[in-house]
C-alpha cells in the first residue's frame, strides 16, 4: 500500500487554525499615536493598545473573561476605544468604551435585551457619535446622540416605522429608510429633524439588496449610493444633494462595486473595488494610486487597507500571502516604509497550506457560478488544478444565503484539505456581489434551483475526476446548514454524509421566529423565500423544508447548534433530530448552551471541529486528529449519537 503525498504532509493541529490568533484586527488611532489589535488575555480575545512608536509596549485595555471581543473601533477624537459585545451569542450587542488616558471602562448602552448599533460618526464632531437603540420597541432602533465624554444619551429621533437612518458629518439625520410592500425600500429625506411624507427614492424587490445610500462627503454636498437601478450590477453613484443630479463614479459589468476608500477629512471617494473571483482596486486619486501600486510591488498575494490616520500619513495594511499566515504592517506613506507589526498565526509558518483556485462553473440553466476549490497537499503533481487521482470532497456551503464566498486564506479550506479532502465553495444563485439578476434568480428557489446549483458543481467535480460519486460530503452553517439538510433529504443519494451547523429545518417556523429587529424586512423574506400567509406560499415553504422529508435521510448526519441563536432557534435542530429519532434514523447532535448563531468561543469551535473531522474520517476516509479532550474542555452537550463519531464515546466516558 502506497502513501499519498497528502497523507505524508504534516497534520496541521486544529488549535493552529481555529484557536485564538496571536494578534488580529490591527488599527491605528486617527491621531496616529496608538496602535491597537485583538489578542488573547487569559485565553480570551481582548483589545490591546501600544504606542505607535513602540508596538512591543502593548497592554490589554479590556478585560473580557468569557466571550471574545470581535469588533472594536476608535472614537474619532482618539481618546477612547469602543467595542460591542453580546451575552452567550444572543446578538443583543451593548456598546462599551475605554478611556485611553485612564484605562477606565464603562458600559455606554446599559440596557437589557437591547441591540445597540452605531448609526454615525463624524470628522468634525469628534467627541460624539450617533447610536441606535431598540430598548423601547425591539423592532425599531431609536436614534440617540452619545456624548463619549459624559456618556449622556440624547434622543434625536424616535423610530416607529423605519429600518434605518443615514446621517451626515454634523451627525444630523438626513434620510430615513423604510421597507415597502413590494419587498423594496423607500428613502425619505429628513430636513431639520422632520421626515418627509413621500420618498425621494424607491426600490422594488429586484434592487432591494443591491441599492443603498453609502454616506455623505464631509461638507454634506454629495451623497454616495451603491445603486443597481436601471442596470444589473451595482454602480457607485455620486448625487449632488442640491440639484439631485447623479453621476456614475464607478461600475463593472461582472460584479457590484463593493468597497471604497474615502479621504479621511473630506469623505470624497478616492478608490473603489469590486470582487468577482478576486478583489480588484481602482484608484481615482493619483496619490492613492501611487500608494496602492507601491504596496502591490512589495506584498505577496492580496492586501487591504484596514485603518488610516486622519492626516492619511499612515495606513494599517492587512496582507494575505495565501499560502502562509496573514500579516499586518504599518505603512508610512511619507517615509515610504512598510514595517511588519505582527503575523496573526505564526504557528502556521511552514505549514503545508494550499493554494485556492478561482473557478467559473456553469449551472444547468446557463448561469455562471463563481466558485473556489482547494486540493489536498501533494495531490496535484503537475499543477493543472486537477488531482492526479480522485480524492474525497467536501462541498462547503456559505450562509446567508444573501452573502458570498471569497478568495484568500480560509481556515476551513486549509483544515479540510490538510485532512485529505478537496474543498469546494460555490457562489450559488442568490449569492451577493454579482448583480441583482443573480440574486433574483434565487427568489422562491430555496431547495430547488439554489440546490441544483450545488448539485451541478458536484457533478462537474466528479466529471473532472476531482472526486468520485460516493465520496462527497456537504457541510455548512446557517443557509449552508439548510443546504446540508436539503442535500440529505431532497437528494439523499448524492452525498455520503452531511454536517449542519445552525441550519433551519423548517422554513415556516424559521420565518415565524426571526429576531424582532428583522421584522421590517419581512416583506422581502416573504417575496424571496415564500409567504406563509398565503395557502400557496405556506405549501411551498413546507415542501422546501427538510423537516417534512426527514424520513428520506439514509446517510450520516452531524448537527451543531447554539442554544441562544436568535436567527435560527434551537428548535430548528431539535425538530429534525426528533423526527429522525421517531423514524429510527441515526443522527449526532451537539448543543452548546452558551453559543448563538455559530460558535464564538475558540474552545467550542475547536471541539465541534474535532467531532466533525472524526465524523468525516469515518464517512470519507480522510485523516483526523483525535478528539483528545477537546469536547470535555468545551461546553458541548452531546444530545444524541455519540456512538456514530470515532472516539466521541470514549471522550465522554473519560
Where are these regions (language model features)?
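Generic beta-strand/beta-sheet core signal
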Residues: 50, 226, 239, 272, ...
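Active-site-proximal cap/loop segments of hydrolase catalytic domains
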Residues: 428-654
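Peripheral, non-catalytic segments that deliver or gate enzyme domains
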Residues: 2-4, 18-24, 34, 42-50, ...
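Cap/lid segment of the alpha/beta-hydrolase catalytic domain
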Residues: 347-473, 477-478, 483, 505, ...
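Basic/polar N-terminal segments that are highly enriched at the extreme N-terminus
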Residues: 1-15, 650-654
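Conserved hydrophobic/aromatic "anchor" residues
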Residues: 28, 37, 74, 216, ...
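Short, Lys/Arg-rich amphipathic segments at extreme N-termini
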Residues: 8-28
